[in-house]
Amino acid sequence: MAAIEAVNAREILDSRGNPTVEVEVLLEDGTFTRAAVPSGASTGAFEAYELRDGDAGRYLGKGVQKAVAAVVDEIGPAIQDLDAADQRIIDATMIELDGTENKSRLGANALLGVSLAVAKAAADSAELPLYRYLGGPNAHTLPVPMLNVINGGSHADTNVDIQEFMLLPVGASTFSEGLRWGVETYHALKSLLKKKGLSTGLGDEGGFAPNLDSNRAALDLLMEAIDAAGFTAGKQIALGLDVASSEFYSDGAYTFEGQKVDAAHLTAYFADLVASYPLITIEDPLDEDDWAGYDHFTAELGAKVQIVGDDLFVTNPKRLADGITRGVANSILVKVNQIGTLTETLDAVSLAQRSGYTTVLSHRSGETEDTTIADLAVAVDAGQIKTGAPARSERVAKYNQLLRIEQDLGAAAVYAGRSAFPRFQA
C-alpha cells in the first residue's frame, strides 16, 4: 500500500514554446515523481479535449492555468489517500469527476498528467522501472524507431504536403544498432541537402524541412541518403509516411500537390508509391471521417502495407472498435494525450493487439523531456515507436531512455525489427 499524499501541478513550456501541464505526485512512503503532458499540432477532431485558458493577453490564449487549477483543486483531493497501485480506480475516479464524454470540464491534459505521474510513483514505490511495472516479466521487446527525418505539412512551413517522411531500420539486430543506422542516415541526408543547396532548417520534430518539387522528391532524397550512408534500402532501412490527410481535406475533397482530388485518386497515388519504394507503413492517408475512402484504401493496400489510424482512431477504444468492425486500416497510432488516461490507452492497445492490429507508440509535435512513452512502448510490446528525428533534446530523450532500457534488459532484450511489420515483404 502506497497511498497518495499530495498532488501538485504547474504550467511549464513544451518544445514549441507553448504552455503545458506538469504534475507532481507524493506518496506516503516518500516516493516523489512528476510527469509532463505533450500537445499536438495536427490534432484529430475526436481527441479528448485539451483545456486552454483562452486569455488572448497571456500566452496568446494557450495558457493552461485552468487545467493546473483542476489538478490542484479538484483531482488532487479526489484521489488523495488512494493506493497509487490502483491505476484503474484512480483513472476511473478522474473520469467520473470530469463527467464529460471528451474530458472537457477538467481537461484531458489535467487528467493525463495525474494519470502518468501516479503510474511513475507506483513504479518507483515498487522499486521497478516503469516498463517492468506496467508490462510485467514479459516486457522485453525494443521497438523499431520510426525516425521522422523530413518534416512537411503542419510540422514545417514548406510546400511539402505529406507531414512526415520516416526511416525505419528494420534490418538491424538490436535497437542500439537500428538507432545508429538511423542517425548515420540522418547526417548523410543533411550533407545531401547542403550539397543540393536545400535548407537544413528543422521542423517541429527535428527533421529537415526543405522546400521540394514534390512528395516523391522527399522519398528520392531518403533513398539517396540511405545509399550514401552505406545501407541498403528495403533490406536494412525501409520507409514510412504520415500523410495527415485531414490537414488538407475540406468540403469533400483533398487539396494535394496543387490539385483537388478524391480518395480514389489518393489510393492510386499511394499504391504507386508502395510499388516504387520500400514503403511499408502509411499513416492517416485519408481524412478521419472518410470511412468509405478507408474501405477502398484498405481493400487495395491492406495486404501490402501497414495502414495506421491516428486521427482515424485517436487512441479511443470505441472508435477503434468501429474501425475493426468495418475492417479499415490495420494498425493504430497510440498517443496518450488523445484519450487522456493511461488505463484507456492500455485498453486501446489491448483491443488492437487482440484484433490483429499492430500498435505504434507516438510522441506529439509539442513535446517535453518526459520519457514515459519509451517505457510504455516496451511495456505493451508495441514493436514500433514514433518520436521524431535524432535531434532536439525532447526527441532524443525518448531514444536515450530506450537505450537505457535495452542495457537494463541485457541478454533478454529483443529488437522487434521486421517482425513488427507482418505485411513487409523484402
From Swiss-Prot:
Annotated pathway: Carbohydrate degradation; glycolysis; pyruvate from D-glyceraldehyde 3-phosphate: step 4/5
Protein name, entry field: Enolase
Biological processes per GO annotation: glycolytic process
Gene Ontology molecular-function annotations: magnesium ion binding; phosphopyruvate hydratase activity
Enzyme class: lyase
Record's function text: Catalyzes the reversible conversion of 2-phosphoglycerate (2-PG) into phosphoenolpyruvate (PEP). It is essential for the degradation of carbohydrates via glycolysis.
Binding site for Mg(2+): D242, E283, D310
Recorded name of the encoding gene: eno
Top-level taxon in the UniProt lineage: Bacteria
Cofactor: Mg(2+)
Similarity comment: family membership: Belongs to the enolase family.
Subcellular location: Cytoplasm; Secreted; Cell surface
Organism, as annotated: Clavibacter michiganensis subsp. michiganensis (strain NCPPB 382)
EC number(s) stated in the UniProt entry for this protein: 4.2.1.11
CC terms in the record's Gene Ontology section: cell surface; extracellular region; phosphopyruvate hydratase complex
Keywords in alphabetical order: Cytoplasm, Glycolysis, Lyase, Magnesium, Metal-binding, Secreted
Cofactor binding comment, as recorded: Binds a second Mg(2+) ion via substrate during catalysis.
Main subcellular location of this protein, as a coarse class: cytoplasm
Entry annotated with the keyword Lyase: yes
